[in-house]
Each structure stands twice: as C-alpha cells, then as structure tokens.
C-alpha cells in the first residue's frame, strides 16, 4: 500500500480519478491497466481496501481471542486508524481544486499530508501489535529509564522528520541538488517555506539518525536492535541522497518512503518492547 501510494504521489497521479471511493464509477475502470497514472492510483485504492479489511479482521480476532487488554486496545486503535486513513484519502480527492474549484488547493493538500502521516502511524501500530505476539515480548526484562527515554526521543525525532517529508512531497517542495556540491545536500537552495521544509527535513534526518543509533546501542539484546535499525538507517540515508540528486526518478523517492516506514515501524516495535519491559502487564 505504501509503495503504491508513494509512487502515485511521486508521479503526481493522485487525481487520476476525480471520484471516490470508486474510480470513474467502477472498481474496474477503463484504462487502469494501460495508463500509468490510473494504474498507480487505482492499484493504491485496491491495495488500501485489502489492508483495511485485514486490519478490521485483526481487530475482530483480538476481540475474540486476545486476553491482554493493552494488546486488544491496540488492535482496536489499528482499526480506527485504518478507517481514518480511508477517510483522509477520500477527502483529499473530493476536496481537490479539480472538484471544488477555487484559486488554491490548501484543503486537499492538508488532507494529503494527514493521509501520508497517518499511513506511517498505521503501519507502525501494526508492527507493534505483531511484536506483542513474539517470544521477545514475553521474555522482556525490565528496562532502565534512560533506555525508555532514548526510545521516546528516537521515535519522536523520526516522526518529526516524517511530517516534514510529507509536507515536502505533497506540496512538491523538494529542492533538487543539481550543482554537485556536497554543501547543497545539507543546505538546500531556494527560499521561503519550501526552503525551510527542505532544511528541516534534511537537518532533522541527521538528528534523528543520531537518536536512533543512541537508542540502538542502549540496553540489553543490543544485536537484535542494533542490526536492523542501523541497516535500515544506512539504506534510508543513502536513498535520501539519491532522491534529491535524481529528480527524474520517481522510484527512488518511492523506495525512500517505504524504507522510512520500515525504519519507523521497526523503531516503534523496539520502543514498545522497551516500555513493555517495565511492566508485567499487556
């Protein structure tokens, strides 16, 4: 779902269909298998529908079979987030300038940013629920306060970077690196709000990266935490650099989004494990 949605944004195909939830009034609209913009948007809608049904099934199964109250509540929250996600996506389409007219497109962009950010939260919560059914969760040892603090700081920093990235992508604010200058990787060209969002996203990514590494190096079971987080962080930073030096390649930006979601969800799962470790509940 993230790949399909990210690719749709990368090629600016979010309004390939002006209606919602159907696409041109159909679940099998003409041209969606042959026209790339229609394929991107309609495949995103189909995949999102499948994920939504899966999340509702997860919530129902936890209601029927899960004895731990905290995990059940997380499953219910997942169902709520996925329903909200569908609504945000629909409003992004229905309130677009192409549908309601007007001089600006602020309403649609706000819902698009919310849709992008909520997608990350949905996947992260799904990862936490999955982690709650692992052996590591059941065998968790008490965590130190500094470890829990490091987890919160890392998760908050990464989520902040995600918000700036969503604002950049949905407004098409990305400042490309065309001069070959290393400085331009960290100090984007331009001015105004686009420049500010690029600066916050890039500098924030460096701060978040350090926070992730600090958390990865704390506490017990360091290898199981350090290896996936460090690997995902390294790949994500590399993709971030490629994203701004290859402006004509939508696939790199899409993969950057997907790996970012993998990093955030993995981080949230480990953070939940740390907070689970301080209590015998859930």
Q: Which stretches of residues belong to each language-model region?
A:
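Polytopic transmembrane helical bundles with strong interfacial aromatic enrichment
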Residues: 1-282
């Amino acid at each position: 779902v993230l790949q399909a949605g990210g690719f749709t944004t990368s090629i600016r195909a979010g309004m390939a269909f002006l209606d919602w939830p159907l696409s041109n009034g159909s679940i099998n609209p003409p041209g969606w298998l042959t026209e790339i913009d229609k394929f991107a948007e309609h495949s995103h809608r189909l995949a999102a529908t499948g994920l939504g049904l899966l999340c509702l099934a997860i919530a129902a199964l936890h209601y029927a079979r899960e004895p731990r109250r905290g995990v059940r509540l997380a499953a219910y929250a997942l169902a709520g987030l996925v329903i909200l996600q569908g609504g945000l996506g629909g409003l992004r389409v229905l309130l677009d300038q192409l549908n309601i007219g007007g001089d600006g497109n602020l309403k649609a962009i706000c819902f698009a940013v919310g849709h992008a950010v909520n997608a990350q939260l949905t996947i992260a919560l799904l990862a936490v629920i999955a982690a709650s059914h692992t052996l590591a969760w059941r065998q968790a040892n008490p965590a130190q306060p500094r470890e829990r603090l490091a987890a919160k700081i890392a998760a908050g920093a990464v989520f902040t970077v995600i918000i700036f990235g969503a604002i950049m992508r949905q407004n098409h604010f990305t400042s490309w690196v065309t001069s070959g200058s290393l400085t331009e990787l960290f100090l984007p060209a331009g001015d105004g709000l686009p420049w500010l969002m690029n600066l916050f996203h890039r500098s924030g990514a460096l701060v978040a990266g350090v926070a992730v590494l600090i958390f990865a190096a704390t506490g017990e079971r360091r290898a199981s935490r350090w290896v996936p987080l460090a690997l995902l962080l390294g790949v994500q930073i590399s993709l971030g650099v490629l994203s701004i030096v290859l402006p004509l390649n939508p696939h790199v930006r899409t993969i950057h989004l997907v790996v970012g979601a993998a990093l955030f969800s993995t981080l949230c799962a480990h953070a939940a494990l740390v907070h689970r470790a301080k209590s015998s509940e859930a």
